[in-house]
């Protein structure tokens, strides 16, 4: 039994990191596909498309949850792996931030279409901007000064994680008009007047979605291959 459990805490964290990556990217592809089908007004009637949209919103909680958990996990990993001697309070703070973010995401989802959800999302938006600045700053500082993160692949990975944050924020920004546009579609029915603006918004959002996918794959490549 001892031999079967012969693995380190760092190895366990790496395993969890891989699981979260799979859930993040895999579920997000599912969200993308549901969005693709929602766009097909010639194939589905409006009630069917609204069901697809509800499934999309529910499934989207998986990548959002994985994203929030990635923050404390990455900090804990670099500390446990000996890549960066993070003080205990820093690790604890990262888990506190992750817990708050997770609560905001799920509270907004449970109380959707309420002032409480709107408040949660505003706080989450500010939090994500702060985390974007943190990871971008960490990556740039490490690449320019050679610390606190080294080797180069790890510093680059931190920088790219910050870019993922930035692109994901742009997804939310680009998607924001969907609420009123969808409300108009439901109230007035399907027509070029209600469908075309919604389609344009979704097309713009898809650009940022593809950018996130590419950055996720590039980050995974760096973590696995460690090319430099």
Regions found by a protein language model. Give the residues of each.
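Polytopic transmembrane helical bundles with strong interfacial aromatic enrichment
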Residues: 2-228
